[in-house]
């Protein structure tokens, strides 16, 4: 509020409030009205993360002003197709943890650039920043993606990505690695950081320019894996891809962009929206809601995926 006051903006002058709302649980993508149900759910979700404060703050502003408050493409959005959830390990299913807000915003921008609506086309978006997510957007839904939190997909600046299972089992049981160590490699100290000692792409690019062959090999391997995932997701929509998007901080680098584009440009036009557009996405979502261009949904707390309905399906080991 102090920051608004310093800019001469009164809370009452704002037409709508839009924010990053964590701990809502799996829902479809889109815009949800922030109400008592949302606030009660997120504050009792048992999640210790600053993102849980988004909904209560927005709701307080809305109540104080009588203006609407929205959650736009919230981080737990899960729209995976059933076939994308299956793994070969009984009871272990894939879930969607992805940079949803920036993913969808960039797909919307790509669609507009190509002269179509987001729901009209198929897009593959690779967000490469501190984390790395690749998602297939089929007519407005992210039907397949890697799981950023659970250690799936291409390796990232500080995350391990896909790895062969048996060496990991050996680390845990034969070499005595602790759960903390292994969780760290999966989500904090793996990837470029583990291999090169830094997760700063700018430092790595400088090393490559100075002749560091190992840095070049590792960095290109990350781009290689991104390209492989993008090409694989083209099969999800039977090759009918309208646009491919590269976004996130690493997409500022011409070497990375060139490496990926050379390998996937034959599939569809490659658009580059370097950096992230989460603040823009929040504002754009609120504007779509106010203009009536996108429906505002009511949050129920019911997850978008409750398990497989077919007979014989094994229960999720995580409940």
Predicted features, each with a name:
Residues 2-16, 113-116, 230-242:
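Phosphate/pyrophosphate-binding loops at sites that engage ATP/ADP/AMP, CoA/4′-phosphopantetheine
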Residues 4-50, 68, 76-87:
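Short beta-strand-loop/turn "lid" adjacent to the catalytic site in phosphate-handling enzymes
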Residues 16-19, 68-74, 124-126, 136, ...:
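General beta-strand structural signal in soluble alpha/beta enzymes
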Residues 53-60, 71, 86, 91-122, ...:
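Glycine-rich phosphate-binding loop plus the immediately following alpha-helix
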Residues 184-238:
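Adenine-nucleotide phosphate-binding core of ATP-dependent small-molecule kinases
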Residues 241-260:
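Glycine-rich phosphate-binding loops at beta-strand->alpha-helix junctions
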Residues 251-252, 271-315:
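Glycine-rich phosphate-binding/hydrolytic loop that grips phosphoryl groups
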């Amino acid at each position: 509020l102090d920051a608004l006051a310093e800019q001469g903006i009164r809370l009452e002058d704002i037409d709508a409030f839009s924010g990053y709302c964590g701990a809502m649980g799996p829902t479809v993508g889109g815009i949800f009205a922030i109400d008592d149900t949302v606030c009660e759910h997120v504050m009792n979700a048992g999640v210790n993360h600053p993102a849980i404060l988004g909904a209560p703050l927005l709701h307080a502003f809305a109540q104080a002003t009588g203006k609407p408050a929205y959650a736009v493409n919230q981080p737990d959005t899960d729209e995976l197709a059933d076939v994308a959830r299956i793994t070969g390990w009984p009871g272990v299913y894939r879930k969607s943890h992805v940079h949803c807000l920036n993913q969808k915003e960039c797909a919307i921008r790509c669609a507009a650039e190509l002269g179509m609506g987001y729901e009209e086309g198929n897009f593959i978006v690779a967000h490469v920043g501190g984390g790395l997510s690749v998602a297939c957007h089929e007519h407005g839904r992210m039907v397949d993606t890697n799981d950023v939190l659970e250690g799936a997909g291409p390796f990232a600046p500080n995350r391990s990505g896909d790895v062969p299972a048996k060496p990991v089992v050996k680390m845990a049981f034969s070499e005595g690695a602790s759960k903390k160590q292994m969780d760290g490699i999966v989500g904090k100290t793996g990837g470029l950081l583990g291999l090169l000692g830094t997760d700063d792409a700018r430092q790595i690019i400088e090393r490559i320019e100075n002749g560091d062959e190992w840095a070049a090999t590792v960095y290109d391997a990350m781009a290689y894996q991104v390209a492989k995932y993008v090409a694989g997701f083209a099969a999800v929509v039977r090759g009918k891809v309208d646009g491919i998007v590269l976004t996130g901080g690493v997409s500022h680098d011409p070497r990375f962009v060139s490496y990926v584009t050379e390998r996937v440009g034959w599939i569809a036009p490659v658009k580059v929206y370097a950096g992230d557009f989460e603040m823009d996405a929040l504002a754009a979502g609120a504007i779509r809601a106010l203009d009536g261009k996108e429906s505002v949904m009511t949050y129920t707390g019911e997850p978008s995926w409750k398990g497989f309905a077919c007979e014989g399906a094994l229960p999720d080991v995580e409940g």
